Every structure is written in C-alpha cells, then in structure tokens.
Amino acid sequence: YIEISGGSLGHGLPIGVGMAYSMKLKKEKRKVFVLMGDGESQEGSVWESAMIAPKLNLDNLIVFIDRNNLQGYGRADELLSYEPIDDKFRTFNWEVIRIDGHNVNEIIKA
C-alpha cells in the first residue's frame, strides 16, 4: 500500500529514508519503495537524503526515478541540469540500475 504521497517538492525520499531507518532500528524485514520524478531531484532535500541513506546502510530502501524530464515549471534539463544523475547517486555509494520503467520484468529483476 502507499503510506504517503509526498508530492513534487522532494519530500518522498527524506520520508522514505526515515521510514527505512526506523525499520532497520526495529530489525523489521521490510522494504521502502520511493517513486520520484527527475524534476523533484532538483530539490536539496533529495540530495541530503541521497547522501545520508548509504551512511545509514539502508539496503531496505529502493528508489525509482521517473526520468521524464518534466517538472512544475517546464523541462527539467532546461531549468537545472541534474545529469549525469546515475553518477551522482553512485558518488554517494548507491547501487544504480537503469531500467525501462514500462517493462514490468525489468522492474522485478532490478
């Protein structure tokens, strides 16, 4: 089920980090899935969360980024380039897998 709907202002990943950390502390064998947009990745709270998650060893946190190049005020890459986003997440020690989000088999495999 969906626990929260964070909207487009970068709140989903910080909340997801908090939920995943809480589950780790309680030794719960659950996973947190965060679906966010590439435009949302222009928010500072996303990057703060991206930096802290690996430090907390949150291997129970899975993040999907919809790379549709859209955000509230236009095309994401015209307003603030975030590319190469894969490399940015890898710099913070994330395991990054690029998939076709329209392919259910690729999602399950990832």
Language-model region placement:
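Glycine-rich ThDP/TPP pyrophosphate-binding loop and its adjacent helix/strand module
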Residues: 1-110
